[in-house]
Swiss-Prot record:
Chief site of localization: mitochondrion
Record protein name field: ATP-dependent clpX-like chaperone, mitochondrial
Subcellular location: Mitochondrion inner membrane
Entry-linked PANTHER family: ATP-DEPENDENT CLP PROTEASE ATP-BINDING SUBUNIT CLPX-LIKE, MITOCHONDRIAL, ATP-DEPENDENT CLP PROTEASE ATP-BINDING SUBUNIT CLPX-LIKE, MITOCHONDRIAL-RELATED
Organism the protein comes from: Saccharomyces cerevisiae (strain ATCC 204508 / S288c)
Gene: MCX1
Family: Belongs to the ClpX chaperone family.
Length: 520
């Protein structure tokens, strides 16, 4: 009878503990590596939206992958520890309730077996090893795609992201925004879900504007080194208490008519698992790097340091030479290969630029983006998902107009943007000026087709910035498809063939060519 009772108890006990082990195993499985896109998958997704920047995309893909791998590992260890404690409490409770069986060899063997099963669920977890946090610093000229890289990664990972302009940050007590505003924005973008916000991405843009001045000029530095110091605790990973005005809806009449007010609410956010991406153009950093490398070569060659007076003269001449240049300086390596100077950025260079060593120490991954060339800008116009040309074609389609832009015209636009030195961000401005009056006149008219060719872009470059109304454009009515196809084919045969298939007309049909007309 005693043996039978012991067996019944053990079966019930085993079943209960088994459920805990299964629960632990299931929860651990939810955080497995398979849920994180691989670096190759991340880069492939970035390739769909971003042209060029191969090295930058690879560095960020690996950094993001390892960051969320670290989060998963931390979650596994936490869940494993909680389940282990739960099992221990259950065993103690059962031993207390049924002390007669506590020394039963069968129970002890069963417990050891269940404990082995539980430990098997976490066999890949090294509980003594803690993975360090690796934030990222991205250096690159304006318009090179820094912010787009971050927002695209957040999209594929389905995590909230908040972008903060560091030029607006000041020390606590001064007019401006406190550093905690970046966490507040992330929390808002996470719809006030603290757990989700704690796995998000914070982008600190224009971090170079926080560089501490080289020398004090008798004024209080409220947005430089002091702000950098304030950012240290947040970036490293601490629990931060913030007060946020959270919208609250009120039913005012019981008939689904609601009003919204804002109520102060306190949240505690742990920044340990938030990925910080620090970005900036760092204008002039390339010149500093070139100077550093030149000085090193001279020291190695002559065996003595460069005179400070000579260094100052070289720096002055270099500043004059590159003051109005949109390109970055290059460095020739010992093997004869030339690389962009920013590719050789070191933590020491960033400290010399004006960032404090403590901040640089919390951002171990540094990568540089290249200035975009004409071919890059050309491909950006038409190739990525959400390409600029696709957007404008879609807009014109909404009011019944087919927008046709030739390849030569796109190359001219790319060259124009390169000349202005505004990078990819400048492409939209040029397209807006190019299509301003076309967009104004076409809706509600009998115009069915618009052709933007090389001559159209040339006419834009010949006008003043504010006189984009003088751009030469070709217009076609609905029954002038053949004229459109013929004019397009003269400059872009591939587009002409595509239009012929799309519109169902032959370009060989001879119809009067519609004259060029300017929008005035």
């Amino acid at each position: 009878m005693l043996k039978s009772a012991s067996q019944n108890f053990f079966r019930a006990y085993s079943s209960r503990i088994g459920r805990y082990a299964a629960t632990a195993s299931g929860k651990l499985a939810q955080s497995r590596l398979s849920n994180i896109p691989t670096p190759k998958a991340l880069k492939k997704f970035l390739d769909e939206y971003i042209v060029g920047q191969e090295i930058g995309k690879k560095v960020l893909s690996v950094a993001v992958y390892n960051h969320y791998l670290r989060i998963n590992d931390k979650q596994k260890k936490g869940e494993l520890q909680r389940q282990r404690e739960l099992m221990e409490r259950e065993k103690i409770a059962d031993d207390r309730d049924e002390p007669i069986f506590s020394g039963n060899s069968e129970s002890k063997a069963g417990w050891r077996n269940l404990q082995r099963q539980f430990n098997l669920a976490g066999r890949e977890v090294d509980e003594d090893l803690e993975l360090s946090k690796s934030n990222v610093l991205v250096v690159g000229p304006s318009g090179s795609g820094k912010t787009l890289l971050a927002t695209t990664l957040a999209k594929i990972l389905n995590v909230p992201i908040a972008i903060t302009d560091c030029t607006q940050l000041t020390q606590a007590g001064y007019i401006g925004e406190d550093v905690e505003v970046c966490i507040e924005r992330l929390l808002v973008n996470a719809e006030f879900d603290v757990a989700r916000a704690e796995k998000g991405i914070i982008v600190l843009d224009e971090i170079d504007k926080l560089a501490k001045p080289a020398a004090s000029i008798g004024t209080k530095d409220v947005s430089g080194e002091g702000v950098q110091q304030s950012l240290l605790k947040i970036i490293e990973g601490h629990k931060v208490e913030i007060t946020v005005k959270r919208p609250v809806k009120h039913d005012i009449d019981g008939q689904k008519n609601q009003t919204t007010t804002k109520k102060d609410e306190v949240f505690v956010v742990d920044t340990s698992n938030i990925l910080f991406m620090i970005m900036g153009a760092f204008v002039g950093l390339d010149k500093h790097i070139v100077k550093r490398i030149e000085d090193m070569k001279k020291i190695q060659k002559a065996g003595e340091s460069v005179e400070s007076s000579n260094s100052k003269e070289v720096e002055k001449e270099r500043a004059k030479k590159f003051r109005f240049s949109n390109t970055l300086e290059q460095v020739e390596l010992d093997n004869g290969k030339k690389v962009c100077a920013l590719d050789l950025t070191t933590p020491t260079d960033l400290v010399s630029f004006g960032l404090i060593p403590e901040l640089i120490g919390r951002v171990p991954i540094i990568t540089a983006l290249q200035p975009l060339q004409r071919d890059d800008l050309f491909h950006i116009l038409k190739e990525p998902k959400n390409a600029l040309l696709d957007q404008y074609e879609y807009i014109f389609k909404q009011f019944g107009v087919r927008l046709c832009v030739t390849q030569k015209a796109l190359k001219k636009v790319a060259q124009f943007a390169l000349k202005e030195g505004t990078g990819a961000r400048g492409l939209r401005g040029i397209m807006e000026r190019l299509l301003l009056n076309v967009n104004y006149d076409c809706p509600g008219s009998n115009i069915a087709y618009v052709l933007i060719d090389e001559a159209t872009v040339d006419s834009l470059q010949e006008t003043e910035h504010s006189l984009a109304s003088q751009v030469d454009v070709k217009y076609y009515s609905g029954d002038e498809k053949d004229s459109l196809i013929r004019d397009v084919s003269e400059e872009d045969k591939k587009l002409g063939v595509m239009l012929e298939k799309e519109l169902g007309h032959s370009a060989n049909i001879h119809t009067p060519t519609i004259p060029k007309r300017s929008l005035t």
